[in-house]
């Protein structure tokens, strides 16, 4: 099966007070944290990401992008598998696992797209964080019949995490970080 662009979203909710506290505690920067992705659970797009695939890709992403401060993401999902620097809005600062949840800390950048993202958060807009990657999927036979569920295959490659308006993964709420990062 050929690789396709796979995008999956988790919602983020942040209060105005949390935003203001994060900015104050982080020298003017908005830093948020929460669930980036979930393994071994069906999301709203009908996809299941096997834990071993996500663990491998998260480690690779952290080693190659996060540690070198180039884990950039965009505001909205592009049609491309390449991060466009003109649309960069945030940078992932760290990632770690809590059971099947991939948690992360994200800095909103002072770029045009980052400033839009910050104002959307300040206005109380509910946003989602979404993984973007390339890979193939195979149908999963559910006990109750064909329901369209697919499993992401071993060829999956994680590209970025983007902020979007339409979440697909349950429970990914980002909250501001109120301590210096």
Residue ranges and their predicted role:
Residues 1-65:
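Polar/acidic, low-complexity leader/linker segments enriched in S/T/G and N/D
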Residues 8-16, 22-24, 29-34, 71-72, ...:
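Residue microenvironments linked to proteolytic maturation
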Residues 56-59, 77-80, 104, 145-147:
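Short secondary-structure boundary micro-motifs
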